[in-house]
């Protein structure tokens, strides 16, 4: 029986070699090995260690990954075993993430009060400017109304002329005289308003630039301190699908995929951009936290801060000082964000 089985295998090998001259058992083994190595390299360079941990510990996540990647059972098992060997690397990166969270906490506790003071000073000054713009505008409107009313004297004088035996002509003459003066006053008031508004806009622009610099510095430091933490902001299910599609492409093309994905070392700028929607970071992170089965309060704090900073920068971009009301509204929204950041700072300080 054993001899018959060996004979069948021998016949199959001859048939395969005749129909596929370049194929050998050793060649297929090397090809699978090369594919596994490429996938391992891909995971090391582009996949978050936390995401890898979820894939290795969640049967549902792994089955979905295998299904989307269209991996045969044998290749999937081999890849799983190879990825398990990366767990020390995952542990190291988890420790690194905890260190960066602690680094962020220490830095934020120390530096934020000074940043808050500078931004608050800008907010208060912007409100003063808004009040001054409104006051000047109101005064100029009153001046224009007064100058316009003097023209009524001339109109009344012409209308009353047939009935007043010329008496109304004196009214008209007075109106003309006042009209000349009021026209000059109207022009002057417009010049005053335009000049002051331009000056106020320049001052507001400088204040905006100052607080923007503070916020951008805060954002850049956050990006530098918390790249691993920011990878949490990506939707886990969608990211799994992206990884599986790239692995599928690797398997079919036998070539390394070049397009960037969820790089945990090189966090793309648009990761921070996606945090603008209020509530989204917390929702996504808690979803990942459920998969991990552990609390991620430190991550939530960092993402809340990043979200508020980015939102505040967006407010800066929209502030053009076109009116006192728009300045007040912008200052109010910025202050609300600053208050939330202050609350986070107080919570961290309380431990």
Swiss-Prot record:
Q: List all membrane-crossing ranges.
A: none
List cellular component terms (GO). extracellular space; intracellular membrane-bounded organelle
Cite the record's tissue specificity text.
Widely expressed; the highest levels are in spinal cord, placenta, adrenal gland; also detected in spleen, bone marrow, uterus, trachea, mammary gland and testis; levels are low in brain, heart and pancreas.
From the record, give the cysteines joined by S-S bonds: none
- Record keywords: Lipid transport, Secreted, Signal, Transport
Q: Which residues form the signal peptide?
A: 1-21
Which GO molecular-function terms appear in the entry?
A: lipid binding
Q: Where is it mainly found? A: secreted
Which cell locations does it reside in? Secreted
Q: Which GO terms describe its biological process?
A: lipid metabolic process; lipid transport; lipoprotein metabolic process
Among InterPro entries, the record links this protein to: ApoL (IPR008405)
Q: What does this protein do?
A: May play a role in lipid exchange and transport throughout the body. May participate in reverse cholesterol transport from peripheral cells to the liver.
Q: Which family does it belong to?
A: Belongs to the apolipoprotein L family.
**Per its record, how is this protein called by name?**
Apolipoprotein L4
The taxonomy runs: Eukaryota, Metazoa, Chordata, Craniata, Vertebrata
